[in-house]
């Protein structure tokens, strides 16, 4: 049978197993035991008494005495009293300002009319009709009817435009075709191509020669055949090769030098 460590099952005091007597289980000596208020109060009293004794020692020491003398020289107590008094006066002033603001607001609300009076519509001013005599209107002259003409004033100028009729066809042929002019005004116009009045003709190329029609062949007659026209064919001129080694090499034709491969063992 294997050995079993029963110490892991025992109650613990921190990380150490508690293997002593069992009558102290449930008291304040173990973790999770009963809480003692008397021990807490005694600890607080001891802490307060230690602070008091330390303060008395510091106050009665030479350093404390020098500090008290310095505070008396600077009138520290009077400054503290003045500060407290100024703070109290400031609080009182703030309260007075808040009270005065509330009083002013209530007075303004009492002076304003109620809401019912605001909703009432204000009476509109009455309209009074006043008759005024206007000057007579100027009557416009009557417009002439469509059939009647408008009378002309005495001092009215009439613009007359004279237009020349184009010449007749026969007259234009007699005069001949005119050359284009350089200016549109008659006195300043000059012909472009000369002063002679010659008719303009259209030069056309001469007509192509016509081929006479061939007679229709009949039985027993030989049909003459037309000879084909001779056509000149241009042949390229041969290059004259110079008598040098390059032309000689170019004229050589053949397979070149014959070569023979032989394997020999030594």
From Swiss-Prot:
Alphabetized UniProt keyword annotations: Capsid protein, Cytoplasmic inwards viral transport, Disulfide bond, Host cytoplasm, Host nucleus, Host-virus interaction, Late protein, Microtubular inwards viral transport, Phosphoprotein, Ubl conjugation, Viral capsid assembly, Viral penetration into host cytoplasm, Viral penetration via lysis of host organellar membrane, Viral release from host cell, Virion, Virus entry into host cell
Record motif PPXY motif, residues: 166-169
More details: All late proteins expressed from the major late promoter are produced by alternative splicing and alternative polyadenylation of the same gene giving rise to non-overlapping ORFs. A leader sequence is present in the N-terminus of all these mRNAs and is recognized by the viral shutoff protein to provide expression although conventional translation via ribosome scanning from the cap has been shut off in the host cell.
Gene name in the database record: L3
Region entry Involved in endosomal membrane lysis, spans: 36-53
Example GO biological process: viral release from host cell
Family indicated by similarity: Belongs to the adenoviridae protein VI family.
Any one GO cellular component localisation term in the record: host cell cytoplasm
Domain notes: N-terminal amphipathic alpha-helix domain is essential for the membrane lytic activity. Late-budding domains (L domains) are short sequence motifs essential for viral particle release. They can occur individually or in close proximity within structural proteins. They interacts with sorting cellular proteins of the multivesicular body (MVB) pathway. Most of these proteins are class E vacuolar protein sorting factors belonging to ESCRT-I, ESCRT-II or ESCRT-III complexes. Minor capsid protein 6 contains one L domain: a PPXY motif which binds to the WW domains of HECT (homologous to E6-AP C-terminus) E3 ubiquitin ligases, like NEDD4.
Organism per entry: Human adenovirus F serotype 41 (HAdV-41)
Record motif Nuclear export signal, residues: 67-76, 247-258
Post-translational modification note: Ubiquitinated by Nedd4 following partial capsid disassembly; which might play a role in intracellular virus movement during entry.
Name this protein carries in UniProt: Pre-protein VI
Chain residue ranges for the region called Interaction with hexon protein: 48-74, 249-255
